[in-house]
């Protein structure tokens, strides 16, 4: 089964916890703190594997969670960093953040990698908190939580040429004639429901990859007839070969077909109109085809170059292939998304915190709920089993301005304050 879009969950590994320990050696009184730091959590890394051709494997495994870092140890020993979790994807995979729609990675070449979910840093051991006024601190941090997100994987086939047109115009037959590909061919609409790829050799030491894309219908740009799934694969092609049935046996007008398909390409993505398009008048071996071709030429005008062919008899196919090969040589590759200006925005793949530090809401029972990336991260990295860590967390909340914000919202002694699933009493 060909699968070209899936939604999966990824989570980087949490950092290892820091250690509270002290140096205990003979003849070394008051040895001081010796707790090591936790190791960094593993990243979730996508890597291109050229042997893959579909996202089928992701239908059976949709959750990818990397290992956490090793905890810190005594004698100042730091925890080990965990090995990154490598997730193999086929060439042509685009990774998008499900929540924001931001493109996180465009993976096209074998061995190319991208970090999709970063692991958290290790928590600091108590040796990191030693000061002149507190030489033996009872403080250590928990590991930083790893980044987690839902992502959409979209596979866009890597082909130089894309065959487009209405169903049953002869796209699959043409591909089978010019390459070794063997797409399914039958006398009914939508015989092709997945892209088929074939390597075409022109006979003069030139070759290119051609994709037979499923037939389009009116409204495809809006998703009609699985239009989004089909049009997605045209975005990477450099040349569009527009196949039109000149026989008229389907009861459609060739010129109306031409206008409809071009409108669908334009409505789906304006960049598709920038690609050179070769118009192919197919089924010229059929009755009335020549008459229909002349009427078609009168409507489109002389500026549109038309290649009359018969995919069945191979009439005109050779000239068509030479024209396509020439266009590929002179047409650059088109990016599938706008290039991000890194001077004004964040670098792609960078794990960024939210701009707002915290938000305070009040529930119907009077409980104050504090949320936000910074405060939730600080909370998760605090070891509440140790008094000094609790006091440090209270100082951090004051430093963030949370105490003052709670008072401004009307919080009084004894009111309940909630962070994540934990509740505290507010003490003014």
From Swiss-Prot:
It is an enzyme of class 3 (hydrolase). GO terms for molecular function: GTP binding; GTPase activity; magnesium ion binding. GO terms for cellular component: cytoplasm. Keywords: Cytoplasm, GTP-binding, Hydrolase, Magnesium, Metal-binding, Nucleotide-binding. Residues 350-428 form the OCT domain. Mg(2+) binds at residues 172, 192. An essential GTPase which binds GTP, GDP and possibly (p)ppGpp with moderate affinity, with high nucleotide exchange rates and a fairly low GTP hydrolysis rate. Plays a role in control of the cell cycle, stress response, ribosome biogenesis and in those bacteria that undergo differentiation, in morphogenesis control. This is GTPase Obg. It comes from Bacillus thuringiensis (strain Al Hakam). The lineage of its organism: Bacteria, Bacillati, Bacillota, Bacilli, Bacillales.
């Amino acid at each position: 089964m060909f699968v070209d879009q899936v939604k999966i969950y990824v989570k980087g590994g949490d950092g290892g916890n820091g250690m509270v320990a002290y140096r205990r050696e003979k003849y070394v009184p008051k040895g001081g703190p010796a707790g090591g730091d936790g190791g960094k959590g593993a990243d979730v890394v996508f890597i291109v594997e050229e042997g893959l051709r579909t996202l089928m494997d992701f239908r059976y495994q949709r959750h990818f969670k990397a290992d956490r870092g090793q905890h810190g140890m005594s004698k100042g020993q730091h925890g080990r960093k965990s090995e990154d979790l490598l997730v193999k994807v086929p060439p042509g995979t685009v990774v998008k953040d499900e929540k924001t729609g931001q493109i996180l990675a465009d993976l096209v070449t074998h061995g190319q990698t991208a970090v999709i979910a970063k692991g958290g840093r290790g928590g600091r051991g108590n040796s990191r908190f030693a000061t002149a006024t507190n030489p033996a601190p009872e403080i250590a941090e928990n590991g930083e939580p790893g980044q987690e997100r839902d992502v959409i994987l979209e596979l866009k086939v890597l082909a130089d040429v894309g065959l487009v047109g209405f169903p049953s115009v002869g796209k699959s037959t043409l591909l089978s004639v010019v390459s070794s590909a063997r797409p399914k061919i039958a006398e009914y609409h939508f015989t092709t429901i997945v892209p088929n790829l074939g390597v075409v050799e022109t006979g003069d030491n030139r070759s290119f990859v051609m994709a037979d894309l499923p037939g389009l219908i009116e409204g495809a740009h809006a998703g009609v007839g699985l239009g989004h799934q089909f049009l997605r694969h045209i975005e990477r092609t450099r040349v569009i070969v527009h196949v039109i049935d000149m026989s008229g046996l389907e009861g459609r007008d060739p010129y109306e077909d031409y206008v409809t398909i071009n409108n669908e390409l334009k409505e789906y993505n304006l960049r598709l109109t920038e690609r050179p398009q070769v118009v192919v008048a197919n089924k010229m071996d059929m009755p009335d085809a020549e008459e229909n071709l002349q009427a078609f030429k009168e409507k489109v005008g002389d500026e549109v170059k038309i290649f009359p062919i018969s995919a069945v008899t191979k009439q005109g196919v050779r000239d068509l292939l030479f024209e396509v090969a020439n266009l590929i040589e002179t047409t650059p590759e088109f990016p599938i998304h706008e290039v991000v200006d890194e001077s004004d925005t964040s670098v792609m793949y960078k794990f960024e915190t939210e701009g707002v530090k915290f938000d305070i809401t009040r529930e119907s029972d009077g409980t104050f709920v504090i949320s936000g990336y910074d405060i939730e991260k600080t909370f998760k990295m605090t070891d509440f089993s140790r008094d000094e860590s609790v006091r440090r967390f209270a100082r951090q909340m004051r430093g963030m301005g949370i105490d003052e914000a709670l008072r401004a919202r009307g919080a009084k002694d004894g009111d309940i304050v909630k962070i994540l699933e934990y509740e505290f009493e507010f003490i003014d």
